[in-house]
C-alpha cells in the first residue's frame, strides 16, 4: 500500500515509540528533519493513539535531534528552528506534544512513563532503548494506514531456524495487538459517527436553550 502518511510505531506494554525518519544513513537524517514532516508524524500518532489504542487525550514526548537537545543552540539549531516550531503548531491543533527532550536523560529518568508515546528523530535514537526494554515482547505497528499492519519487533533471525531457540512472544504479541486495534477501531468508529452539531448561542440573549429534539426531527 503506497502511502506517504504513516509512522513506524514500536509498541510494548511499557512504551510506544514513533520515528520521524526510519531506514536512512545517519549522515542523511538531518536533511530529512523538517517542520512539516514532524507535524505530520505528530498528527498521525495522536490520531492513532485515539482510534487504535483508545487513549482519549494522548500525551506525546518529542525528542531533539542533537545531544542534549541542542543545548540552547550550542550543539545545533534544529531544535529551535525546526522541532520547537512543529511542537508549537501541533499544540495549536489540539495535540498534546511536549519537548524537545534529550533522549538519554529522558529514558534514564524514566520520564517515558509519563507519556503515551514518544516521537524520536531517527532509528537508533528510539529503537535502542525500546528494544532494550521490550525486545521479546515488542511489536512493530504501522500507524496511519486504513488497515491494521503489525509484525514482531525483531528481525527474521534466520540463524535460529531449526535450533529450537527462537521465542514466539513478539509474534504472539503482534497478533494480539492487531486484534485489539481492530476492536478499538470499531468502537471508535461507532462512538464518532453522528456527532452533535455545533450550535451558535448568543450569550447576550436571556434564553440560551437549544431545541436539540427539533434539530433531530429535521434529520429523519
Task: Identify the residue ranges that each predicted region occupies.
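Anion-binding alpha/beta catalytic cores of soluble intermediary-metabolism enzymes, centered on
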Residues: 1-78, 84, 88-220
Amino acid at each position: 500500500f503506497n502511502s506517504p502518511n504513516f509512522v513506524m510505531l514500536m509498541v510494548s506494554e511499557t512504551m510506544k515509540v514513533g520515528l520521524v525518519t526510519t531506514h536512512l544513513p545517519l549522515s542523511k537524517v538531518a536533511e530529512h528533519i523538517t517542520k512539516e514532516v514532524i507535524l505530520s508524524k505528530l498528527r498521525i500518532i495522536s490520531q492513532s493513539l485515539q482510534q487504535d489504542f483508545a487513549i482519549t487525550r494522548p500525551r506525546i514526548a518529542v525528542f531533539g535531534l542533537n545531544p542534549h537537545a541542542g543545548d540552547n543552540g550550542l550543539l545545533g539549531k534544529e531544535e529551535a528552528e525546526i522541532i520547537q516550531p512543529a511542537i508549537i503548531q501541533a499544540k495549536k491543533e489540539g495535540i498534546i506534544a511536549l519537548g524537545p527532550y534529550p533522549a538519554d536523560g529522558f529514558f534514564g529518568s524514566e520520564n517515558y512513563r509519563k507519556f503515551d508515546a514518544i516521537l524520536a528523530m531517527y532509528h537508533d535514537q528510539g529503537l535502542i532503548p525500546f528494544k532494550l526494554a521490550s525486545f521479546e515482547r515488542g511489536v512493530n505497528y504501522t500507524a496511519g494506514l486504513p488497515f491494521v499492519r503489525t509484525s514482531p519487533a525483531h528481525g527474521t533471525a534466520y540463524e535460529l531456524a531449526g535450533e529450537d531457540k527462537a521465542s514466539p512472544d513478539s509474534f504472539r504479541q503482534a497478533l494480539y495487538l492487531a486484534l485489539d486495534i481492530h476492536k478499538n477501531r470499531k468502537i471508535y468508529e461507532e462512538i464518532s459517527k453522528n456527532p452533535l452539531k455545533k450550535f451558535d448561542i448568543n450569550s447576550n440573549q436571556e434564553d440560551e436553550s437549544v431545541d436539540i429534539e427539533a434539530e433531530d426531527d429535521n434529520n429523519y
